């Protein structure tokens, strides 16, 4: 959930999954 790298953030996404695992989920 970071502007630098959407794939890597370490923060919990809205769905509760890590940003690193929700690479495609963000788009």
UniProtKB/Swiss-Prot annotation:
**What pairs make up the disulfide bonds?**
7-23
Ordered alphabetically, the record's keywords are: Disulfide bond, Hormone, Secreted, Vasoactive
Pfam families given for it?
ANP
Q: What is its main location?
A: secreted
Q: Is Disulfide bond set as a keyword in this record? A: yes
InterPro entries this protein is in? Answer: Natr_peptide (IPR000663), Natr_peptide_CS (IPR030480), Natriuretic_peptide_brain (IPR002408)
An example GO biological process term is: cGMP biosynthetic process
Where does this protein reside within or beyond the cell? Secreted
Show the GO cellular component annotation of the record.
extracellular region
GO molecular function terms noted in the UniProt entry? hormone activity
What superkingdom does the record give? Eukaryota
Functional description taken from the UniProt entry: Hormone playing a key role in cardiovascular homeostasis through regulation of natriuresis, diuresis, and vasodilation. Has a cGMP-stimulating activity.
Q: Which family does it belong to?
A: Belongs to the natriuretic peptide family.
Indicate what this protein is called per its UniProt record: Natriuretic peptides A
Q: Which organism is it from?
A: Anguilla japonica (Japanese eel)
Its gene? nppa
